[in-house]
Amino acid sequence: MPKHSPPDTSPVARFEQSLQELEQLVQNMETGALSLEQSLGAYERGIALYRECHQALEQAQLRVRLLSDPMHPDDGEPFDPSLVSTSQ
């Protein structure tokens, strides 16, 4: 009998799942097919998912800062994509 692997509960996987669920909720709400009660429930769930995603992104940003300079994480400067060279 094959073993089932446990679901991935890493922060990245949870973020991806939350974002996917949030996108699906928005899509369902935009169709206008939900009742008022369903729309309110979807909105409440969407807010919770948004907060989870926002918190995960903040934690990822802090982690990158700590990895960049663990002694002075607040001295990091915001990433500027225009400084990255795309030519090789």
Curated annotation (Swiss-Prot):
UniProt KW Plastid keyword: no
Matches recorded under InterPro entries: Exonuc_VII_S (IPR003761), Exonuc_VII_ssu_sf (IPR037004)
Domain of life: Bacteria
EC annotation from Swiss-Prot or TrEMBL: 3.1.11.6
GO molecular function: exodeoxyribonuclease VII activity
Catalytic reaction(s) noted: Exonucleolytic cleavage in either 5'- to 3'- or 3'- to 5'-direction to yield nucleoside 5'-phosphates
Region of interest called Disordered, as start-end residue ranges on this chain: 68-88
One Pfam family per UniProt: Exonuc_VII_S
Record keyword Hydrolase present: yes
Keywords: Cytoplasm, Exonuclease, Hydrolase, Nuclease
CC per GO annotation: cytosol; exodeoxyribonuclease VII complex
GO biological process, one term: DNA catabolic process
Compartments where located: Cytoplasm
Family (UniProt): Belongs to the XseB family.
Stored NCBIfam families: PRK00977.1-4, xseB
Function: Bidirectionally degrades single-stranded DNA into large acid-insoluble oligonucleotides, which are then degraded further into small acid-soluble oligonucleotides.
Subunit structure: Heterooligomer composed of large and small subunits.
Descriptive protein name: Exodeoxyribonuclease 7 small subunit
Gene: xseB
